[in-house]
């Protein structure tokens, strides 16, 4: 794994946590007014770009026959599904526990929060069935329930299918690049059609999750092949120059996220800038790469998948104090919430993510 990209993944996961707490859960406070937090959902697109680049790097030469494709799917399934299933169940269970506590308090004449217990729909059997088969984010439902960030997980799962099929049947590098570029162009055309008013106007996962994932994922694939093409000529590029390029792209990426509401159609340039940022980090040296390789960010990167999936369960328990308390006490709640997320992520990483990932590797190796 490229360590700087691992660290970048950790930063992205933490930003999504802040978005869901301050914006989606309506915790408010000063951070909810910052464009970087309001638009932190865009870091999911960065996840897709990173995933495309890493898949092309690791599996570009490994999908040559049916046995290798089978091993790929087994490893991907065991990498994603066990933690997805557990966190879906814990997210549902957390709501039942919290709403049950509110109901019990109401019976004693104590009101916790503004809503009545169980007043908001929190479980839908049809959505749960789609979650079980990883179809909740591909456009079959018009909402995101339960462990709602997992919509992107379902998109990623089917992106792996598209990637494996493409790379199995298309063997030459040139053809793969052209095919990936065609997918990117088609997705971009789809979103420009949306922006022009000819398509669904809500940029939500239920409508646009799959094209959104396809666009960013195959930008990532192109990033890897672009790096492969120029790597021999850039081998002697100084770390100072490379670091300056990384810094410009990091600042540009964060600025575009912050200004998202004012960009108009240029918002669709953000995944391409993400792609350039990831491209600049592939050598794993330079000032930004060094920052992302620090121990705290590496820890976040290693645990990023668990952080991403477990934080909604934790957020459910902190939702009422997060909204009730004003500043500055709110930030004490935020600090405890983040620590609880990191602790929960450590537990799920150690006891669910890693053991099942290793089981998948062993099972894939038997073929």
Which residue stretches match the model-derived regions?
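Specific transmembrane alpha-helix
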Residues: 44-60, 152-169, 180-235, 267-289, ...
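Alpha-helical transmembrane segments of multi-pass integral membrane proteins
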Residues: 213, 217, 222, 240-354
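Juxtamembrane transmembrane-helix termini
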Residues: 44-78, 83-109, 221-228, 314, ...
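Hydrophobic alpha-helical segments with transmembrane-like composition
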Residues: 80, 126, 132-188
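Interfacial loop-to-helix transition and helix-capping segments at the boundaries
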Residues: 2-3, 32-44, 126, 142-155, ...
